[in-house]
């Protein structure tokens, strides 16, 4: 029984270590994915900020160049303004498209990571359910084996106790018969001692109460040995005194 419990405890600790290791792997994977997403987001943000900075610089340079150019060439101001407006519109359109593409890619990456985390959580839940099922099965088997072992031990102990009691009772009966045949002067004292021993033995072996033992003692001369109290006294009076 101790070995089964130790084996069960070792299996439980092994499962616990496996679950802990699996949780650690999941946390490391989740942390790695989050770090990767954070790095990508920071890189995209830095690129966007750099692009915006370059755009502002370009816009400032363009504005300065345009102002100088317009100052130098007043005759072609409208044409240059239209051209610059087209370039700015195209640049803004490209920037918006790039930003939308980056945002869409980031959303797709976030969805993919969320699906991976959900799959890992489902797998961990299934493993925990399987572990609990195996644990309940192991506990049930251990209880059944322990109960069967206890029943076998109790049956064997009962058989040994019955055999010992029968043997001891036979020896007591034989000794009482021998004492009855010899009719010695001290037979009465020996018989009383044997009666008391038999009563104590009955209490110890069969678990009788003190009142039951007294009933057995009161009924012993006539019921067990077939003698009445007067026969008992007559035998004692007719028995020579032997030291």
UniProtKB/Swiss-Prot annotation:
Its main location: other. It is found in: Gas vesicle shell. GO terms for cellular component: gas vesicle. Signal peptide: none annotated. Keywords: Gas vesicle. May confer stability to the gas vesicle shells. Gas vesicles are small, hollow, gas filled protein structures that are found in several microbial planktonic microorganisms. They allow the positioning of the organism at the favorable depth for growth. Belongs to the gas vesicle GvpC family. This is 35 kDa gas vesicle protein.
